[in-house]
């Protein structure tokens, strides 16, 4: 038998390549036409009510925890175990973040001075120099009260009525 007899009658090598490329080209053309219409992830038209969605999100960590705790499931795939571990990490991260936020709020709240009645009780978290602020304020208020009693013409606190500005001296005021 010759080689020509072993060949399938009907399609030559060029025709066979063109026949297999034709569906591929038509598929690519179809995808190119539809690419502009798809601009995001598909959204399910049947959304769950918020209560059921919250319940589902609460059940996921419980199911993963029970799945990972049971060692009697050797037939479970490694990929499924990894998925459960990733989900458990995702659900634990927001809890850790809220714990950090609560600690920051606690420290900020108790770093302020606490006033009980007439006495000022300063927390030990406050910087020692910040404890001097009330004393400085009291000194300034005393100085202000002393300056009130002195008249505007009389020298008070080292200032006089017509003082030179910007280093300039006026002969009429000396």
Curated annotation (Swiss-Prot):
Post-translational modification Methionine sulfoxide, affected residues: 141
Propeptide: 38-105, 170-174
Stretches assigned to coiled coil: none
Tissue specificity annotation: Expressed throughout the gastrointestinal tract with highest levels in the duodenum and jejunum. Low levels in spinal cord, hypothalamus, and stomach. Neuromedin-U-23: Expressed in the small intestine and the pituitary gland (at protein level). Neuromedin precursor-related peptides: Expressed in pituitary gland and small intestine (at protein level).
Keyword Ribonucleoprotein applies: no
Keyword Secreted annotated: yes
GO BP annotation list: eating behavior; energy homeostasis; gastric acid secretion; negative regulation of eating behavior; negative regulation of feeding behavior; negative regulation of gastric acid secretion; negative regulation of gastric emptying; neuropeptide signaling pathway
Family: Belongs to the NmU family.
Protein name as annotated: Neuromedin-U
Lineage of the species this protein comes from: Eukaryota, Metazoa, Chordata, Craniata, Vertebrata
